[in-house]
UniProtKB/Swiss-Prot annotation:
Belongs to the shikimate kinase family. ATP binds at G9, A10, R11, A12, S13, G14, K15, T16. SUPFAM superfamilies: P-loop containing nucleoside triphosphate hydrolases. It holds the Pfam family SKI. It catalyses: shikimate + ATP = 3-phosphoshikimate + ADP + H(+). This is Shikimate kinase 1. Its EC number is 2.7.1.71. One of its GO terms (biological process) is amino acid biosynthetic process. One of its GO terms (cellular component) is cytosol. Keywords: Amino-acid biosynthesis, Aromatic amino acid biosynthesis, ATP-binding, Cytoplasm, Kinase, Nucleotide-binding, Transferase. GO terms for molecular function: ATP binding; magnesium ion binding; shikimate kinase activity. It is an enzyme of class 2 (transferase).
Amino acid sequence: MATTIYLIGARASGKTTIGRALASVLNYAFVDTDEYMSATSHMTVAEVVAKEGWVGFRRRESEALHAVTAPKTVIATGGGMVLATANRKYMRAHGKVFYLHVPAEVMAERLKADPNSAQRPTLTGRSIVEEINEVMAERETLYHETAHYILNGSVPVERVVKQALDMLGG
């Protein structure tokens, strides 16, 4: 197996954490599209949004997706990667897509505990729980239609990785 693996899901669903662990077990490379964008633009996600707006950020996000796609790579995508139809089609056509499903309350707790959450701009200007519920109402269907597989991202990392390996047939 030398496929590309894409992890999709909301902010704080565990894409980066699970991605690193899965890549390690598979002996694959790991890339986080937000980290890639920050490294190539020399700006944080918040700075890109402040300077270029959400349209500019989404453009950079799509460019990053294409740039990092490679065989034997696990890619943690930004939470909004699925908003562009072209990105959804691209991921499905170029690899296996896993949706990390996590309850809103769990994501809210993770965001509250994340020291980097200040670098992640609010999408709606609301409280964390309100924002997560609003964003998930908009994106849940897109995550489901994009994914080849759905993982329970609220269990320990090792169990999520095992779920993914079982689904991949290994």
